[in-house]
Amino acid sequence: MMTGATLCSGIGAPEQAMPWVEWQWCAETEKFPSAVLAARFDHPNLGDITAPDFIDRALSLKPPDLLIAGTPCQSFSIAGLRRSLADDRGNITLRFVEIVNAINPPVVLWENVPGVLNTKDNAFGCFLAGIVGASAPLVPARGRRWSHAGMVDGPKARAAWRILDAQYFGL
């Protein structure tokens, strides 16, 4: 059976959507979503992923085959100030990369808004570089913007992405 864990877990949408996965743990800080997670699922909530000891606590548990995160989108959204990685919330994305590299799960799924593809500081290129093990931020193949779908290879991993619109999936 595939095992999984979630970061920035919210109310547990991945856990609900994929009941065949053996969920090992989650990480959520907000009070209401944490209460929902506790009521619906029996796996531990490791809390704040920015805590200095988070990686050690995660490594002390069974490693997941699948790691899913929906890091905060406000710093990347076109509806916001677009501070990107200059915003603490945007930097949680880079913390996610640190966690991925420490845990090294076979499969990683990251959810965010399309605005992350075209920030002034190339946040998506920084994210991809961290995931695939590149030594510098990656840059889009054509033009100044990342495409809505693509794949990159790096020294440590391969990453693919695609923009999907939830309205077309009955959500």
Predicted features along the sequence, with ranges:
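Class I S-adenosyl-L-methionine
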Residues: 55-64, 76-171
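Short glycine-/small-residue-rich Rossmann-like dinucleotide-binding loops
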Residues: 72
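N-terminal Rossmann-like NAD(P) cofactor-binding module of classical short-chain dehydrogenase/reductase
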Residues: 5, 66-68, 109
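Active-site flanking residues adjacent to catalytic metal/cofactor-binding acidic residues
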Residues: 27, 47, 69, 110-111
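Feature marks short, surface-exposed loop/turn motifs that line or immediately flank catalytic pockets
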Residues: 13, 33, 75, 116-117
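Short helix-loop-beta connector
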Residues: 1-2, 62
